[in-house]
Amino acid sequence: MCIRDRDRLARSVGKQLMIDSAEIAGLMNDSAFQQKLGYNKETLPCLFIPETYQVYWDMSAEEFFERMQKEHQKFWNQERLDKATAIGMTPTEVCTLAAIVEEETNNNPEKPMVAGLYINRLHTGMPLQADPTIKFALQDFGLRRITNAHLAVESPYNTYLNTGLPPGPIRIPSPIGLDAVLNHTKHNYLYMCAKEDFSGTHNFASNYAEHMKNARKYWNALNERKIFK
């Protein structure tokens, strides 16, 4: 399940445990509680590591968050912390980038490639220009074609207008997504475009001219299928 906001997470937890979802949501929206955990409202989703856990169904909301904090610390072992440091990122920044990577592709083998591309952009000061951040900024996750009008949306999550990472993750990434960033593929690609066969994978390019050739193939495929939005 893709969880993009705190309210949906609260509802999901409430269905599994004897905790009122409003109580979970209340804590997640409490700035003092966020700060106690080491986050703010934008970065709090980074606390959660999606996995199957055995928990007491009658645990309290506070106990739930304590357990999630322990699982977070368990995931972020020294090896992963060292890998994050090596690429100049904190765990929260890794989470934020992993969320974008997982929105870009459902293809697990491709995720380290996509992560490597975004890390290249970050290291060269280029905007990420990640379409999923536009969908998040607009809260329109059904968009299939991003237009110039969409790219003009004023939002700190618009990675076309703002350089660097957005304020927080646009979804809760999986362990696979997090590890894709930590173990990203090293290459010289700076551009990518969805493949014209709609396979869910991408064509990668190291320069803009090559990228535009790939983009035209995809645009033509969209036009042929009459996908205009």
Segments (PLM) and residue ranges:
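Bacterial extracytoplasmic/cell-wall-associated proteins, especially those involved in peptidoglycan
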Residues: M18-A22, G26, F33-K229
